[in-house]
Amino acid sequence: MDKEKIVIQGARAHNLKNIDVEIPRDKLVVMTGLSGSGKSSLAFDTIYAEGQRRYVESLSAYARQFLGQMDKPDVDLIEGLSPAISIDQKTTSRNPRSTVGTVTEIHDYLRLLYARVGHPVCPNHGIEITSQTIEQMVDRVLEYPEKTRIQIMAPIVSGKKGTHKKTIEEIKKEGYVRIRVDGEIYDINDEIEIEKNKKHSIEIIIDRIVIKEGINTRLYDSIEAALRLADGYAVVDIMGDKELLFSEHYACPYCGFSVGELEPRMFSFNSPFGACPTCDGLGTKLEVDVDTVIPDRSMSLNEGAIIPWRPISSQYYPQMLASACKEFGIDMDTPLEKLSKEELDIILNGSKDKEFYFEYKNDFGMTRETWIPFEGILPNIERRYRETNSDFTRDQMAQYMTDLPCPSCKGYRLKEETLSVKVNDHHIGQISEFSINEALAFFDGLELSEKETQIAAPIFKEVRARLGFLKNVGLDYLTMSRAAGTLSGGEAQRIRLATQIGSRLTGVLYILDEPSIGLHQRDNDRLISTLQSMRDIGNTLIVVEHDEDTMMAADYLIDIGPGAGEHGGRIVAAGTPEEVANNKNSITGDYLSGKKFIPVPAKRRKGNGLELEIIGAKANNLKNVNAKIPLATFSCVTGVSGSGKSSLVNEVLRKALARKLNRNHAKPGEHKEIKGIENLEKIINIDQSPIGRTPRSNPATYTGAFDDIRDLFASTNEAKVRGYKKGRFSFNVKGGRCEACKGDGIIKIEMHFLPDVYVPCEVCHGKRYNGETLDIRYKGKNIAEVLEMTVEEGLEYFTNQPRIARKLQTIVDVGLGYIRLGQPATTLSGGEAQRVKLASELHKRSNGKSFYILDEPTTGLHADDIGRLLKVLQRLVEENGDTVLVIEHNLDVIKQADYLIDLGPEGGDGGGQIIATGTPEKIARSKKSYTGKYLKPILERDKERTEERIATAKKK
């Protein structure tokens, strides 16, 4: 067996056409090809699946039943496999307890650091809380030079009111001759005037010593006596200098604030020993959001100002509100903004104990009457959310609630005792709020004692290494407290990549899925060098990628195609990037060599003269941003990772437009106002989420073509004779579907410690319908055969049915002619799902008042796919007069835009400002813009190519 290669023979997963391929080991290998060509089928569903399966098979049957079993891939032979680790975008943790710090293990090292070198500080008095042995106290005092005069005291009263006569009498009985009261020294026999109503501090003076050789025993005895008298506390007054407070306890001598023994678990917000008891370590509390409950205060109660109590299904709450308003004299026709503070308080928070007469008439005409206090809208929503057993009700109430920082821990997630432990005046929560760059600077400037430095050295080494890896993959703007669930797919993947680099494993096969997603061109070089360093320590990297820089940096490039779906699944070219670029059969090669390219538009649109203006956006890291978006244009928001693009577009603009135009309850990010919304009628967010969560959803159902197809089958003569309506041809309802498999076509057989087996239904043989339904044919085919057609075949088949043909044509236009009409939604990639959504929008009639938002639509798309996507987006603007706004890093998309908004200059706190706006040419001239710097050579190169192409065409 050749140990230098991974040999694959006869791979047939999904659309792979029985392919053979050899992949060099210990190299950076990039797999590319059109979206849907079979890259993931080869990389993840064949190579990774087999590597993982072989490892799991080595375990006992008992252990295997607890692990996610991989199906044996459809392949004849794979040799030369190493243990495989998959780093994709789908396995991001959505657990609210996961943060960047916990995922990268940096937080674990910080917990260890604080447990070993942290100093507890009383939050009330700001003094350090220490626990020391008498030997440590003696050693500390003897650090002072000889002839230093000291007095040892026992603090027996600390900040307490009273004359304390009894205490002084007891001191006298003990035989002590001097005391200090409020800083003044008295003889015990003096007449000491102590005011009863003032707070006082009293210390017994145990001994006065001059530091010299041989005083150790006397010093030890005196401190021991002080500790005994003052319940474990002693004060050593260094004459002419400061006082030292010693304690045998981890407790403040003034207020008794105590901290237990420092342990790593005390600094974990996922442990009951460290988590804030108010929020259970989540850092937030779910509270009812008044602005979501009453989004428009210019409306009256009768106009439905209170969204959750609108009389849609039940009349119970509207009737209760009317009765309460009658009792408390609140006018239901007055806009809420004109009601008095007291009236609004009753509506929102209730009438407390004051009861009112309530007569309720239900839908059946029955009347019930009672005297009850008015609960109030906010407590009502909170109670229903907390007490309900219905998921539907909980989801309904959750729409009106928002996460606010916990009032006890201020969002730091940890209990007060934990947050009192400091290193260099910072508690662990404050360090977690640092960005990666700030954390690196903090640890570089940390000042510790010699002993502490020795203890912390191995911890610093690990923390610095992990922070460095995160910086190298372009994530230096993230904070360690950032919740893992809020990260984009690309960010989450690069974090896992950084974690793997930190483990420094060798001999491993890493399989990555587009690690460059969401990464600005500026940070691409760092990512590529990170991948190369993983290769250099002895690992094989297989990267599914479309980014040109990554492809050119590969040791070996595999192009899978030539087309997508049925037209793909073959190895078109394999070799060095230069060899692939010169391969005439490779579309990827044509783009790498410049034979094919996406042209620069001849002119930029100015729009229709109207614009959308965002004023005072402050969500996340946005710094009071004002931005204008010209309507009827193709606009693009750019900027380095973390600069605030998603905050501006998704958090502020999309949510504000959805709230106004779609009556959505989502609360927009902080901003002053948005002008020009009246020029729009609908907002459409086209993301890469699946078009359906179950295999029952498919492209035909999503685009609405299946409705028309069912109508067509129901209108055939045979269907009319049998009395079949359109519902007969649905696989979701009883009647026409096969009841043995409930219209799924497959039956799941659970195998416990083996993977579940899916077998075709024995009754319908995978066709989903019963025999009677399949008897109905249109142009020789039944409904099951139609669902098995590709979209291209369907378009030809339904060419005389304009309603269906129009919908199928748009799917072909977005480059998805190869997918099957009945292909389960769960088998579509993110890029494919996004284009199905685009297709369903394309066939709708538009009046030019639609606003489309796309967040990184090029994810998973080859340069050829991007060309097709851009034609569709330009068509929405050109033909319909609609507005398209895209968040994007891909320079091919950016250069085609009419208008750019570039955010920056950096990520995180260093971003959130608009650096430049205008046409791509204007941005390219900007000295401050990183986007402009990388865009300029691309514009120049592609303008030359476009001119050459035009000149060549003219000669012909």
Curated annotation (Swiss-Prot):
ATP binds at residues 33-40, 639-646. The keyword Disulfide bond does not apply. Residues 309-587, 607-936 form the ABC transporter domain. Its main location: cytoplasm. It is found in: Cytoplasm. GO terms for biological process: nucleotide-excision repair; SOS response. Belongs to the ABC transporter superfamily. UvrA family. The UvrABC repair system catalyzes the recognition and processing of DNA lesions. UvrA is an ATPase and a DNA-binding protein. A damage recognition complex composed of 2 UvrA and 2 UvrB subunits scans DNA for abnormalities. When the presence of a lesion has been verified by UvrB, the UvrA molecules dissociate. This is UvrABC system protein A. It comes from Listeria monocytogenes serovar 1/2a (strain ATCC BAA-679 / EGD-e).
